[in-house]
């Protein structure tokens, strides 16, 4: 039965793609353009910097500087503070890459990776400013700050989820290879491109056109499409809050692909997205009422 459904869905999508080939082709080209202009420039350099950071003492510096209060507040190991700090700059799915690096080198365990993933669902600040450029700059700054704040709140809410870890006083720097780092960064970048193209192509086949529906599949496309509609600032902010909370199937697929061999439990991650959604909408409504 399962195979029958898979085959039926495959034939259905294949038929739709053939029938709507010009529309799908246009959507794919738009996806490539979006990735080239907004995603790749903000993600690729930071992934290489992340690899380079593992070859230096920067993780130890960060862990020794903010690791102790971070560990006490969130009940995570000190080295997890490095992931949170870098995630505020690079966002998702790069946060998964940082967590994967620590997990692969056995600096953290699987349970801690799950807990850390739930509270680092952030976005590259430059990317947010780019895709929300049709709105006032203060809205973009509000979105960046609020999203970081909500992830901190989620970390506090989840702090009592017990994990076992051995505190590491000093992490040994890893050997850095620029060629290997570029190769890994390109692989993740291509994964992101493939996800964006796939979901934007699927969106083009859906007869109902609405930014929220687009955002459910692919967030950057969903937010940028808002400028084509005559929504008020209030509705734009609420719609963006919803999309940033969920992140879109594209980003979730990318994150799961990075951890494909680690068999993480995503229940805490999904629960945290619901909390994220509720908090983001409530804070946005308060912000609209008090400041706009």
Residue ranges and their predicted role:
Residues 1-9:
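N-terminal membrane topogenic signal
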Residues 8-23, 28-40, 44-48, 52, ...:
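Selected transmembrane alpha-helices and immediately adjacent juxtamembrane segments
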Residues 282-292:
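Juxtamembrane boundary at the C-terminal end of a transmembrane helix
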Residues 70-133, 215-227, 235-260:
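Alpha-helical membrane segments and immediately flanking helix-loop junctions
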């Amino acid at each position: 039965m399962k195979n029958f459904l898979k085959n039926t869905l495959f034939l259905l999508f294949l038929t739709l793609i053939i029938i709507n080939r010009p529309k799908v082709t246009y959507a794919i080209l738009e996806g490539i353009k979006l990735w080239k202009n907004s995603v790749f420039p903000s993600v690729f350099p930071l992934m290489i910097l992340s690899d380079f950071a593992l070859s230096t003492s920067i993780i130890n510096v960060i862990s020794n500087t903010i690791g102790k209060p971070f560990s006490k507040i969130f009940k995570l190991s000190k080295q997890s503070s490095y992931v949170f700090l870098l995630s505020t700059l690079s966002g998702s799915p790069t946060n998964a890459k940082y967590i994967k690096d620590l997990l692969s080198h056995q600096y953290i365990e699987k349970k801690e990776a799950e807990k850390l993933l739930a509270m680092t669902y952030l976005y590259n600040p430059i990317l947010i400013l780019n895709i929300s450029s049709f709105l006032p700059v203060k809205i973009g700054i509000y979105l960046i700050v609020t999203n970081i704040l909500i992830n901190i709140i989620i970390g506090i809410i989840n702090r009592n989820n017990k994990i076992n870890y051995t505190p590491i006083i000093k992490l040994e720097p890893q050997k850095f290879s620029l060629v290997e780092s570029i190769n890994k960064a390109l692989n993740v970048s291509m994964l992101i491109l493939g996800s964006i193209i796939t979901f934007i192509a699927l969106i083009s086949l859906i007869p109902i056109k609405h930014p929220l529906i687009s955002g459910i599949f692919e967030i950057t496309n969903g937010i940028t499409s808002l400028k084509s509609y005559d929504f008020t600032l209030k509705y734009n902010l609420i719609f963006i809050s919803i999309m940033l909370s969920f992140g879109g199937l594209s980003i979730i697929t990318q994150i799961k692909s990075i951890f494909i061999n680690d068999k993480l439990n995503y229940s805490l991650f999904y629960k945290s997205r619901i909390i994220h959604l509720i908090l983001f909408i409530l804070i946005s409504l308060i912000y609209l009422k008090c400041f706009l």
